């Protein structure tokens, strides 16, 4: 019996992938929508693995053309979700069927209107009040104010099922993130103590807390948790996203939000940004 190691081995792995949901089979409409989405998001989704979800489309899909269009935007396709004839055509095109075991509760990926900012909610839920207290403590220099897990709105928790199990311990980053750096907190919250520079990306399956200037891109609820939120002591982000609903911040935010403590959350299909007053 040989003791030499084998040339390969099998290890478990969990892949992060973007779910591209099709609402049409028309190649021209898909190409136009893809171009607009990528123009809005800049380089945020570039080189991210993609699963094409065609479960809502019954018309025949030109899979090779769609894969080529996604590839032109640096979006490699690793699998598809489809039914009946489209599933067979996907297999014939060399694509791999996959199962999404936990479909997201938030279906819309439409960005919020460019100039839409919600007003502060007078009767904030418990999660918002807890986050406000955490941010106030952080702004006063209380090092023990950093949470290991953010509180969730109990009403939202009852009506929305998270797309993936959440860990009880947050991923804590205690140094600034430079341009080009990316941090992903899988199945948990992300806490950054320091600046997230322009060009840096922070992603979490749960909530995101930035105790410092948030100048890069932030995506909370990456696996579809619509109750996820983004908290920061200084809001100046390039892009904000919760459960796939995103907003590119092209123009400076209102004075009561720019470089101020803020909360970002979903309200239905709309991304809301709220000031957190100290």
Swiss-Prot record:
Protein name: Probable septum site-determining protein MinC
GO BP, one annotated term: division septum assembly
NCBIfam families for the chain: minC (TIGR01222)
Record bears the keyword Cell inner membrane: no
SUPFAM superfamilies, sorted: Cell-division inhibitor MinC, C-terminal domain (SSF63848)
Similarity comment: family membership: Belongs to the MinC family.
Protein's job: Cell division inhibitor that blocks the formation of polar Z ring septums. Rapidly oscillates between the poles of the cell to destabilize FtsZ filaments that have formed before they mature into polar Z rings. Prevents FtsZ polymerization.
